[in-house]
Amino acid sequence: MKVKFKGKEVTLEGTEIKVGDTFPDFVAVNSSLEPVMLKNTNRVRVFLAVPSVDTPVCDLEVKTFNARASEIDGVSIYTISMDLPFAQSRWCGAEGIKNVTTLSDYRDRAFGKNTGTYIKELGLLARAVFVVDSSNKVTYANYLEEVSGYPNYDEVLQAAQAAK
């Protein structure tokens, strides 16, 4: 899998996730610094891997999914980055984010390494989107070729709706 960050090719560590795969286990950290595992939630989930919520591209991506979350009622949306939970919480509060849950991968990098989104050179996550159904099967996986690009919002929302 080849991914670029601002035009320069970077190395992704971990295993690339494909449609049909079982979504891997991981532990992330919530805004209260508590560990969170999401494997057996018995609902459809959208995972947005982003480098940092506090950058213009990530900011717009999360705000867009937050605004459009009602289009996929009953689906949980998670944004995961290497940001510290305090920074994520501050940003969400300042931006009024209520329909997307932020999680941090700073502690163990388990999400990044288990989904093949961890950028070795930068210690950040590559931009990727995964839709996971209630039986923990991946129904949509997209690693953006350029980390500074935007996902196809309509395509992701359609995939999430279809996974219900």
UniProtKB/Swiss-Prot annotation:
One Gene Ontology term of the molecular function aspect: thioredoxin peroxidase activity
Function: Thiol-specific peroxidase that catalyzes the reduction of hydrogen peroxide and organic hydroperoxides to water and alcohols, respectively. Plays a role in cell protection against oxidative stress by detoxifying peroxides.
Extra remark beyond the main annotation: The active site is a conserved redox-active cysteine residue, the peroxidatic cysteine (C(P)), which makes the nucleophilic attack on the peroxide substrate. The peroxide oxidizes the C(P)-SH to cysteine sulfenic acid (C(P)-SOH), which then reacts with another cysteine residue, the resolving cysteine (C(R)), to form a disulfide bridge. The disulfide is subsequently reduced by an appropriate electron donor to complete the catalytic cycle. In this atypical 2-Cys peroxiredoxin, C(R) is present in the same subunit to form an intramolecular disulfide.
Organism placement in taxonomy: Bacteria, Bacillati, Bacillota, Clostridia, Eubacteriales
Reactions listed under catalytic activity: a hydroperoxide + [thioredoxin]-dithiol = an alcohol + [thioredoxin]-disulfide + H2O
Enzyme Commission code: 1.11.1.24
Protein name per the record: Thiol peroxidase
Presence of the UniProt keyword Cell wall biogenesis/degradation in the record: no
Gene expressing this chain: tpx
InterPro entries for this protein: Redoxin (IPR013740), Thioredoxin-like_sf (IPR036249), Thioredoxin_domain (IPR013766), TPX (IPR002065), Tpx_CS (IPR018219), Tpx_Peroxidase_subfamily (IPR050455)
Record family assignment: Belongs to the peroxiredoxin family. Tpx subfamily.
Enzyme class: oxidoreductase
Cystine connections: C58-C92
Superkingdom of origin organism: Bacteria
Entry-linked Pfam families: Redoxin (PF08534)
